[in-house]
Amino acid sequence: MPARKIILSNDIRVKPTENTLKIGTNKSVDIDGMKVTTLKSTDEGVAFIIEYKGKIIYHAGDLNDWYWEGEDEKENLRMRESYRHIIKKGFENIPKVDIAFLLVDPRQENECGCGTDFFLENVEAKHIFPMHFWGDHKRVEEYIRTRKENIYTITHTQQVFELEGLI
């Protein structure tokens, strides 16, 4: 396993240490055999694609289809197109990931999983963990019931999952 490093988006204001690496959008770095690639976010920071020992982990960060009911339709469609372009381009050579951390944000009401839906229509994911749901576990459970993919149900903060044989 590589030495421990803290990898942050370069727009986060913290004093770097020797174990901190700040990285901008659409960049790749290799850290002791672990490749970390970033994608531009549709909000703040970056999304991460991590490749290590033949496995791929995706963490969406704030990269999402931020479609807000009641907001300007032009802006919603611009955001949707931006998100879809970033996902298609970022994963054009990565058809499958082992773990995906994807947004299911109940503040988006009926569109709470639209970014996750698009991602899963375009990228196969073995293990899917919803995030960014502001403690609204019931809304996430409702969303999961509508999907056929292997989306893990998260019932409380700091819940631990063990995935056998991943690395």
Where in this protein do the model-derived segments appear?
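Active-site neighborhood of phospho(di)ester-bond hydrolases with catalytic His/Asp-centered motifs
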Residues: M1, K5-D11, Y58-G61, L77-E81, ...
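Short, conserved loop/helix-junction motifs that constitute active-site signature segments
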Residues: M1-R4, N93-I94, F119-E124
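Active-site HxH/HxHxD metal-binding segment of metal-dependent hydrolases
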Residues: M1-V29
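Binuclear metal-ion centers of metallo-dependent hydrolases, dominated by the metallo-beta-lactamase
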Residues: T17-S28, T42-E44, C112-I167
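Core dinuclear metal-dependent hydrolase active-site scaffold
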Residues: N19-K96, Q159-I167
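A short, acidic, amphipathic alpha-helical segment used as a generic capping/interface helix at domain edges
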Residues: R84-G90, Q108-F118
